[in-house]
């Protein structure tokens, strides 16, 4: 009687760099025993463009348009950390109004990032419709960006050393508040559709678990860290910009699995929306059209022309020199701790520009999370990390 030969050796499978669920040019060398994952080796570098070396051969003004290509899903965080590094090293003050404008833009960028994560993540799990809902809401924010900066997704080039490029256009604050009122019920709608769906929960609950101590040891940050029960958010820890002026909560869940990472991001969208509402309503000087009218009414010596009501303290010259010294500056981006280590030597270009991207650090834990899991679970785990290869490879 003929016998069916059973394959006993392990299979080496390539996922990516062109697989649609890799979310960029990421290649995973996966060792399989049947359907079970034995090992995984991420292969990176396909999107390396030498961003650190470019920074060391450009002035800050020249380099700013480049930085949107790190995390191209949330480009304004890259601009924020670029100008913050120079401001800290050179001791450049930022007007209060400019700080509020920065916070508004950063939190809107956080929402766009999470929407861009939410849609494809659900599509990876087999739910196609939420992707269309997420893009519908994201379009509102891109229209707001376009009204202020002229660009929609990347290359906003809005942040400047000492402030921002321009003030808000007429009527922008009203449209922004309209979006916030529209968006918060939509997040509730997403939750009703998705969160308690039994298929969705079975795909995520208890999958890709990492303990609190392991998350700290690996150096994880952002939603990856807060989903392990660690209450760590740089907006609260470092007190940068004007986040202390607003009432908001850090999203923390203790389970450490894919579902907890999903819930952290959903809550962060709500909290970001609340921060935007508070910042717009408390904007120093109010909407730009009102501020401009007050200045015209009271003349050149009006208090509304003073520093706190300006959108930039002083524009740096083209030959602005970065003073001698070193500094490490970080912001809480949508994916975690985005940091810059800068060394200046009293020259127009920095002597050293080291980028600390959150995605690069968070990706390191992937092999540990997927060993012993099924192939389908690997897609869910990778999606829950939220990887953008532009910042991983730099």
From Swiss-Prot:
Write out the annotated subcellular location: Cellular thylakoid membrane
One MF term in GO for this entry? quinone binding
- InterPro entries documented for this protein: NADH_Q_OxRdtase_suD, NADH_UbQ_OxRdtase_49kDa_CS, NDH1_su_D/H, NiFe-Hase_large
Could you say which EC number(s) this protein's record lists?
7.1.1.-
Q: Which UniProt keywords apply?
A: Membrane, NAD, NADP, Plastoquinone, Quinone, Thylakoid, Translocase, Transport
Q: Name one Pfam family in it.
A: Complex1_49kDa
GO CC terms: plasma membrane-derived thylakoid membrane
Q: Tell me yes or no: is Transmembrane helix among this UniProt entry's keywords.
A: no
Q: Name the Gene Ontology biological process terms.
A: photosynthesis, light reaction
Q: Which family does it belong to?
A: Belongs to the complex I 49 kDa subunit family.
User: What HAMAP family does UniProt report for this protein, alphabetically?
Assistant: NDH1_NuoD
The protein's job, in short, is: NDH-1 shuttles electrons from an unknown electron donor, via FMN and iron-sulfur (Fe-S) centers, to quinones in the respiratory and/or the photosynthetic chain. The immediate electron acceptor for the enzyme in this species is believed to be plastoquinone. Couples the redox reaction to proton translocation, and thus conserves the redox energy in a proton gradient. Cyanobacterial NDH-1 also plays a role in inorganic carbon-concentration.
Q: PANTHER family from the xrefs?
A: NADH DEHYDROGENASE [UBIQUINONE] IRON-SULFUR PROTEIN 2, MITOCHONDRIAL, NADH-UBIQUINONE OXIDOREDUCTASE 49 KDA SUBUNIT
What name does the UniProt record give this protein? NAD(P)H-quinone oxidoreductase subunit H
Q: Can you name the source organism?
A: Synechococcus sp. (strain JA-3-3Ab) (Cyanobacteria bacterium Yellowstone A-Prime)
């Amino acid at each position: 009687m003929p016998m069916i030969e059973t394959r006993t050796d392990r299979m080496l499978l390539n996922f990516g760099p062109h697989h649609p669920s890799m979310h960029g040019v990421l290649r995973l060398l996966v060792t399989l025993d049947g359907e079970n994952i034995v090992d995984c080796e991420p292969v990176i570098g396909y999107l390396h463009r030498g961003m650190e070396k470019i920074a060391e051969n450009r002035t800050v003004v020249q380099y700013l348009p480049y930085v949107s290509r790190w995390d191209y899903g949330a480009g304004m965080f890259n601009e924020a950390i670029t100008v913050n590094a120079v401001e800290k090293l050179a001791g450049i003050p930022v007007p209060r109004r400019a700080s509020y404008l920065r916070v508004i833009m950063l939190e809107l960028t956080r929402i766009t990032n999470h929407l861009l994560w939410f849609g494809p993540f659900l599509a990876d799990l087999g739910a196609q419709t939420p992707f269309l809902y997420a893009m519908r809401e994201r379009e509102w924010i891109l229209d707001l960006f376009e009204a202020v900066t002229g660009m929609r997704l990347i290359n906003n080039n809005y942040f400047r050393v000492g402030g921002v490029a321009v003030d808000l256009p007429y009527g922008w604050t009203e449209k922004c508040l309209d979006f916030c009122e529209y968006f918060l019920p939509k997040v509730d709608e997403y939750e009703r559709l998705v969160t308690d769906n039994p298929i969705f929960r079975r795909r995520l609950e208890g999958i890709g678990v990492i303990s609190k101590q392991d998350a700290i040891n690996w150096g994880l940050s952002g939603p990856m860290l807060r989903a392990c029960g660690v209450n760590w958010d740089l907006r609260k820890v470092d007190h940068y910009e004007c986040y202390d002026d607003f009432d908001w909560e850090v999203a923390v869940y203790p389970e450490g699995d894919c579902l907890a990472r999903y819930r952290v991001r959903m809550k962060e969208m709500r909290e970001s929306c609340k921060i935007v509402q508070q910042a717009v309503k408390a904007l120093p000087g109010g909407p730009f059209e009102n501020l401009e009218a007050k200045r015209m009414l009271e003349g050149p010596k009006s208090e509304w022309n003073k520093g706190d009501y300006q959108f930039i303290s002083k524009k740096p010259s083209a030959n602005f020199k970065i003073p001698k010294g070193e500094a490490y500056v970080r912001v809480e981006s949508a994916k975690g701790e985005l940091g810059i280590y800068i060394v200046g030597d009293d020259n127009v270009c920095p002597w050293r520009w080291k980028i600390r991207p959150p995605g690069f650090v968070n990706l390191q834990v992937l092999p540990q999370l997927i060993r012993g899991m099924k192939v389908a679970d690997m897609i869910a785990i990778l999606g829950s990390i939220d990887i953008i290869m532009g910042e991983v490879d730099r």
